[in-house]
């Protein structure tokens, strides 16, 4: 309220991963509806995501909390929505429009005549560290859609520092700070506070046992002797290496369930490549555990959703992934993350915090480190904790 009264219409809310940013948006809808009503203004709320699975997840959560949700199916629908002057629905509930940022186009711009009615549009940008790049056309379209809009960027990991390419290599001369795009921080809620308040768990990094390190190293050496020079991705997807890796993972997972006296915990295996993910999934079939392979080109969307829901309900032991589900995925029973590749900066923090959701009486989430992320983990801690 103080920011709005001071004429500030944009900024970042940095709340740690897992602390409930969708819930925060919900409470803001309630509060800001009343705030603008007192000023004779109609508030129109938009929750903006960059992935279809997050759209469905957010819409479901808003409905569960009692909001009326408008879901946008096309750019044409969105053009009609943003040009409309009201938020009327037959339920009497407050309304929020959940929309993919790709629906913003050059045509979805509020015309001067639309300002004749007292309307205040409020945009909540979910996961604002990710796809809202200052050079991207989607963000440019969003920012120009309504010059008077209030823009609240929600993130658990604002982008700070070096930008990396898709292979994880730093791009020379490229730096990024979310504040340069969305404005200063409106509010911050750090990891230590979130842990102290019981909203998230501490993370423990577990190294690999020395005997298994030797076995994995030996497997790599034997592959190189048999096959000659292979690139890293081929080595790590080779059956001999995958066999040793899966043996370790399944043994560790079994021991963890015994040590925690809890058969309900789940695991996620973050693979070095999609080829390795496929190989690990096949190898897991030899063990008395259940697993689902989650890759963008494996199965259709409904099948993947069914597998993800089954994991959340506890009927699948492992999710095997490469890039998918490392952000925006929430499953409290996920307590063991098997990390098979180096991930950088905010992307690393996003991945690690898949295991920080409160569950039963757990105090920790566990990261089993096959990739030796110690240096990256320390660097990320300094930037975000």
Predicted regions: what they are:
Residues 122, 129, 290-385:
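Conserved RecA-like P-loop NTPase helicase motor core
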Residues 7-28, 266:
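Walker A/P-loop
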Residues 53-77, 283, 288:
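Conserved helix-turn-beta segment of the N-terminal RecA-like "Helicase ATP-binding" lobe
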Residues 114-152:
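SF2 helicase catalytic motif II
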Residues 92, 233-321:
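Conserved C-terminal RecA-like helicase domain
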Residues 164-264:
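Interdomain helical connector at the RecA1-RecA2 junction of SF1/SF2 helicase-like NTPases
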Residues 24, 41-64, 271-277:
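Conserved Walker A/P-loop ATP-binding site and its immediately adjacent core
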Residues 63-110:
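Inter-Walker segment of RecA-like/P-loop motor cores
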């Amino acid at each position: 309220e103080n920011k709005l009264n001071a004429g500030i219409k944009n900024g970042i809310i940095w709340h740690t991963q897992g602390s409930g940013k969708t819930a925060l948006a919900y409470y803001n809808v309630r509060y800001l509806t009343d705030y603008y009503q007192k000023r004779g203004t109609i508030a129109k709320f938009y929750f903006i995501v960059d992935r279809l699975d997050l759209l469905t997840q957010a819409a479901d959560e808003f409905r569960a909390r009692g909001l009326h949700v408008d879901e946008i199916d096309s750019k044409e629908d969105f053009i009609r929505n943003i040009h409309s002057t009201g938020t009327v629905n037959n339920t009497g509930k407050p309304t929020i429009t959940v929309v993919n940022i790709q629906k913003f186009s050059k045509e979805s711009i509020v015309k001067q005549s639309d300002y004749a009615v007292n309307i205040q549009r409020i945009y909540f940008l979910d996961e604002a560290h990710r796809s809202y790049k200052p050079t991207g056309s989607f963000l440019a379209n969003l920012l120009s859609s309504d010059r008077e809009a209030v823009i609240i960027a929600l993130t658990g990991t604002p982008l700070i520092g070096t930008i990396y390419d898709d292979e994880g290599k730093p791009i020379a001369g490229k730096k990024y700070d979310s504040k340069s795009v969305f404005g200063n921080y409106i509010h911050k809620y750090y990891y230590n506070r979130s842990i102290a308040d019981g909203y998230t768990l501490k993370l423990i990094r577990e190294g690999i046992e020395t005997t298994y390190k030797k076995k994995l190293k030996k497997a790599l050496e034997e592959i190189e002797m048999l096959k000659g020079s292979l690139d890293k991705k081929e080595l790590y997807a080779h059956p001999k290496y995958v066999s040793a890796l899966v043996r370790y993972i399944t043994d560790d997972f079994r021991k963890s369930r015994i040590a925690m006296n809890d058969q309900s915990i789940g695991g996620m295996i973050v693979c070095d490549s999609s080829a390795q993910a496929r190989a690990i999934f096949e190898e897991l079939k030899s063990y008395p555990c259940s697993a689902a392979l989650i890759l963008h080109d494996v199965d259709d969307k409904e099948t993947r959703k069914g597998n993800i829901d089954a994991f959340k309900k506890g009927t699948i032991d492992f999710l095997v992934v490469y890039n998918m589900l490392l952000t925006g995925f929430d499953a409290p029973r996920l307590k063991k993350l098997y990390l098979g590749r180096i991930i950088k900066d905010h992307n690393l923090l996003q991945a690690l915090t898949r295991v920080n959701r409160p569950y039963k009486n757990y105090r920790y989430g566990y990261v089993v480190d096959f990739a030796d992320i110690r240096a990256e983990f320390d660097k990320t801690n300094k930037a975000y904790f």
